[in-house]
């Protein structure tokens, strides 16, 4: 299994579309649903192969936009089959031979995938960052990520210092839209929109993404980044790639997927 996977190509070559598809697959396997995505659900026929508890599963479905549920997808013509995984037959994983239908598939709402009956528990399997960023919402998402992944306050301090040595601390206030910003020149309370103009765009994007990198390495979920150079300086990109390649750091075998225009990153 590769711990870093790069997608490189000229503009309009399909890099973002591929990462969108990857995010789609991870969302189905992690949440059993598709919701609030930036891409259209209509006209998609999807076939997924995944491994779980000694078996290879083949899942196929048609996807469409829900007529009743806002920003959700519906699943139809779903089929789920399985076969025992043998290392000696690794080259035949994607062969249709030996697959048998999964038994005891119940009825679920149309917006829920039947892979639920195999995986059963929702969990973060991957986090996707598109090339646009989250704007003023970035800071709230960052603090929620710190809480969700149980990362210590010292993590934020180190990440802040990594991107801007003038920032001593950043604290989210109870309304989740105002922040106490401590700089080397003093403290002040600012809104998320004001903070967006105070900090550089690279710092804003980098804060949330780097916190997620740390969580990914800690828990082993994968990270998908579209146009990684839009988030980080080239040197920092190289450092992140090395973190995922270093087995002493990436002990849970997380994988970094990214698209880039940096040809030299492939050296």
What are these regions (language model features)?
Residues 1-33, 187-267:
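Switch/communication elements of ASCE P-loop NTPase nucleotide-binding domains
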Residues 2-6, 19-67:
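Conserved P-loop NTP-binding catalytic core
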Residues 40-42, 152, 205, 236:
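Short, glycine/acidic-rich beta->alpha junctions
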Residues 47-49, 59-60, 128, 168-173, ...:
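A structural signal for short, well-ordered beta-strand segments and their strand-loop junctions
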Residues 48-54, 79-84, 183-189:
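Short acidic, glycine-rich loop/turn motifs
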Residues 63-176:
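Electropositive, glycine-dotted interaction segments
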Residues 165-194:
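Alpha/beta-hydrolase fold catalytic core
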């Amino acid at each position: 299994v590769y711990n870093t996977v790069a997608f490189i190509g000229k503009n309009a070559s399909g890099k973002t579309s591929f990462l969108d598809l990857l995010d789609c697959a991870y969302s189905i396997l992690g949440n059993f649903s598709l919701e609030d995505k930036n891409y259209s659900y209509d006209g998609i026929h999807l076939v997924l192969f995944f491994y779980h508890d000694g078996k290879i599963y083949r899942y196929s479905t048609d996807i469409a936009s829900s007529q009743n549920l806002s920003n959700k997808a519906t699943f139809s013509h779903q089929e789920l089959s399985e076969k025992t995984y043998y290392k000696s037959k690794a080259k035949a994983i994607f062969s249709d031979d030996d697959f048998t239908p999964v038994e005891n598939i119940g009825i679920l709402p149309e917006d829920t995938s039947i892979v639920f009956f195999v995986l059963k528990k929702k969990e973060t399997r991957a986090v996707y960052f598109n090339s646009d960023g989250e704007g003023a919402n970035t800071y709230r998402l960052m603090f929620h990520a710190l809480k969700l992944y149980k990362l210590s306050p010292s993590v934020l301090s180190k990440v802040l210092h990594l991107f801007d040595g003038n920032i001593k601390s950043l604290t989210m206030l109870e309304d989740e839209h105002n922040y106490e910003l401590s700089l080397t020149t003093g403290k002040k309370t600012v809104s998320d929109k004001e903070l967006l103009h105070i900090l550089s765009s690279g710092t804003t994007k980098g804060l949330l993404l780097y916190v997620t990198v740390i969580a990914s390495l800690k828990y082993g979920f994968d990270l998908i980044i579209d146009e990684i150079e839009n988030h980080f300086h080239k040197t920092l990109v190289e450092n992140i790639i090395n973190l995922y390649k270093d087995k002493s750091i990436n002990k849970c075998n997380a994988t970094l997927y990214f698209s880039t225009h940096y040809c030299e990153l492939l050296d």
